[in-house]
Structures are given as C-alpha cells and as structure tokens.
Amino acid sequence: MEGDCLSCMKYLMFVFNFFIFLGGACLLAIGIWVMVDPTGFREIVAANPLLLTGAYILLAMGGLLFLLGFLGCCGAVRENKCLLLFFFLFILIIFLAELSAAILAFIFRENLTREFFTKELTKHYQGNNDTDVFSATWNSVMITFGCCGVNGPEDFKFASVFRLLTLDSEEVPEACCRREPQSRDGVLLSREECLLGRSLFLNKQGCYTVILNTFETYVYLAGALAIGVLAIELFAMIFAMCLFRGIQ
C-alpha cells in the first residue's frame, strides 16, 4: 500500500512539474513578446522604469521556472532525494519572491495613475529630442497609438521644459500631429497647422485611456497566469516533500 502511494505521489509530482515547466515557458514567451512586440507595448513599458524592470523579472522568472520544472520532472522520475530537496528549496524561494513582487505591485500601484503620468510628462518632456529616452519613448507611444499627451493636447500647455525649448512657438509636439491615413511613411496632414494647435490637424485623444486599455488586456492575462503558477508551485512543493520523505 505504501509503495502504491509512493508511486502515485511520484507521478503526481511529475505532472505538477510538467505544468511548472509549461508555465515557465509561457511566462518566458510573454516576456519575450512584450520586449519585441511591434504594436508599441514595449514603448509603453519603457515609459516607466518600474514596469521595464518588471518585464525583465518576468523573463528571468519564466526561464528559471522552465529549468526548475525540468529539474523536478527528473527528480521525480529518478527518485533522487538530492534533486528533490534542491527543487523544493528553489521553488520555495521563487514562490516567496513572486508573492513579494505581487505585494509590492499592489503597494506601488499609484505609480500608474493619470496624475503620475501627467506629472512626469509636464516635468520631463523635451519634444523632438531623440537623445532623451523619456521624450523619445513618449513620441513613439503618441505616434503608434495616434494620441497626444496623457489627457490630451492641453497637457503641453504646462510642459515647462517643452515650452522653454520651443520658445512657446509650438502648442503641441510633432508627435501629436495627424498623419495621412494611406501613407506608409507617416506623412503629416499639415505640420504647420498642427503645431499651431489647430484641432483638425492633431490627435485629440489622450494616451492614458489607450495605455489603460492595453494594460487591462495584458494585466488580467498575466494575473490569471500568475495565480495558476503560484497554485501549481505550492502543490509541487507539497508533493516534493512527501516524495522526499517516502524515498528510502
């Protein structure tokens, strides 16, 4: 009876580790996709160093889970106590790290508010300065999504650095200008009229709504996946310790 129980635990351990292996592969794939996504999600993430760090953490955690899932499968099949103990300790560390990251994300969620983005834009935006990472990122976001500022074109009335650099000669940056719908090269409808703030020639929608909608799509997916991975890790640790204690 004890042998049957041990055998059952062994196969359950293998199954749960296989799911960890798949979960790690999914996290790794999502992390890679976020970093190379051609639709502009990378630019949105790059606008906030905290989020960019999160993307790299996603890549690292995905790769680590991928390897540990493989390690756990080997430990279960070979019934190696050393591998099982090594697996348990590392899964425990990862589990605690993921839990801590989730708590920190909840605590610092105010960094994603409309007020935060507006404050950063009006304080640091420099217009068409490609050497400034912050400004270049915002320009890329506004061009990609056809939006202007955080709330709309009026944000640039309070962008102190932008106003100083343009000597108040431009109401909005060129990135806010509307482009020819059929143009592959992004030809502007009228650069002069746009920079003067003529509403027919600039994008009036703020980028915050676009960013929020984009994040809602990915955050729910990532959140559901993270909960699933945490649950699998918890069961895997239980099975690993039970199998470890059952092996003579």
Swiss-Prot record:
InterPro entries tied to this protein: Tetraspanin/Peripherin, Tetraspanin_animals, Tetraspanin_CS, Tetraspanin_EC2_sf
Keyword Transmembrane helix attached: yes
Compartments where located: Membrane
GO biological process: calcium-ion regulated exocytosis; establishment of localization in cell; hemostasis; inflammatory response; regulation of sprouting angiogenesis
Pfam families in the cross-refs: Tetraspanin
Signal sequence coordinates: none
Keywords: Glycoprotein, Membrane, Transmembrane, Transmembrane helix
Cytoplasmic side: 1-13, 71-83, 245-248
Bilayer disposition of the protein: Multi-pass membrane protein
Chief location: membrane
Membrane-spanning residues: 14-34, 50-70, 84-104, 224-244
GO cellular component terms, A-Z: plasma membrane
Residues exposed to the Extracellular side: 35-49, 105-223
Expressed in which tissues: Highly expressed in primary endothelial cells. Expressed in the embryo heart. Weakly expressed the embryo skeletal muscle.
PANTHER family: TETRASPANIN (PTHR19282), TETRASPANIN-18 (PTHR19282:SF249)
Family per similarity comment: Belongs to the tetraspanin (TM4SF) family.
Oligomer status and interactors: Interacts with ORAI1; this interaction regulates ORAI1 exit from the endoplasmic (ER), and/or Golgi, and trafficking to the cell surface.
The protein's name: Tetraspanin-18
Organism listed in the record: Homo sapiens (Human)
